[in-house]
Amino acid sequence: LKEMQRIVKSVAASLEYRGVFSVNFYVTSTGTLYVKNIEPGLTSIANIYDVTANVNQYEEQLRSAVGMPLHVITPLQIGLLMVVRNYQSRAIQRQWLLKNNWQFRFFNDVGDDDQAILGFVWVTGGDNLAALKNQVDDTEVWNDQA
């Protein structure tokens, strides 16, 4: 995490850009960290801040655009963002009824493609990331990658 933060700070200092951006990483099985890409602007994935921190990307983008100081980001809780695809629809509907620490956002008509993104699930709560991962794994929703 510290290396990721160092890289993001280095990228931010190097860019002549004002606004929200994302740095996406790839980690190999040996633990080597690579920058996958840099995305300027708002992203769906950054919505995780809505439920895990004291800021959201939309307000920070506006503050940046008008020259206001940005908030100091304070983590409020840990969280996972899970992508839900069409083929997982039935399985995720069951979890919707069962999980009180999951938040769901579904998209309108995504078509018939099984791999189309149906929505996102934010899994939050507690301070134990391993416990959240286990909760997700126990559902087996993401085990069957059709």
Predicted segments with their positions:
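Generic alpha-helical secondary structure signal
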Residues: 2, 6, 127-130
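Active-site "cap" helix and flanking loop/linker of ATP-utilizing ligase/carboxylase catalytic domains
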Residues: 3-22, 39-87
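Active-site and channel-lining beta-strand-loop segments
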Residues: 23-28, 38, 121
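Short beta-strand micro-motifs enriched in acidic
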Residues: 26-30, 107-109
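Contiguous C-terminal substrate-recognition/catalytic subdomains in enzyme active sites
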Residues: 30-32, 51
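Protein kinase-like catalytic core scaffold
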Residues: 33-37
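Peripheral (often C-terminal) accessory segments that flank ATP-dependent C-N-forming ligase machineries
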Residues: 62-146
